[in-house]
């Protein structure tokens, strides 16, 4: 999987469309979640994309402290349905964690869907115990120390 790390201003129209289509396919259609994915936060995010043969198969967005949460954070973690079960989710998350480390951040926070608890725990995140509904889906706050 080829990984790219891009600021919003670096997107081509085609690449942006591909990412938004993937997010919509998973977060709106697959999860039957009729909430707005476009949240005006993409412009501040660092976008981490994994592609195979030019097709985006995995994606996250990274925020520096204060842009979303008080701490650095990762969100919108998504793997194309046709490419699941091949560790691309783990790989794109590890790239995102490594990016945070290279930027000198001491910790990460995520808003994780509860059913993915083991996935994030295996990566080194710890649940804080704060569970809540976000867009009608059970989520929990999870953190990771980077130093």
Give names to the regions the model predicted.
Residues 1-47, 51-56:
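Short amphipathic alpha-helix that is part of the acyltransferase structural core
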Residues 38-43, 66, 133-134:
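A short beta-turn/loop motif at secondary-structure boundaries
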Residues 49, 55-65, 71-78:
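Conserved beta-strand in the GNAT
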Residues 64-74, 84, 134-139:
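A conserved beta-turn-beta hairpin within the catalytic core of GNAT-like acetyltransferases
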Residues 79, 85-98:
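Conserved acetyl-CoA-binding loop-helix of GNAT-fold acetyltransferases
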Residues 93, 100-113:
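Conserved GNAT acetyl-CoA-binding A-motif
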Residues 114, 133-147:
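C-terminal "cap" of GNAT-fold acetyltransferases
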Residues 121-130:
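Conserved acetyl-CoA-binding loop of GNAT-fold acetyltransferases
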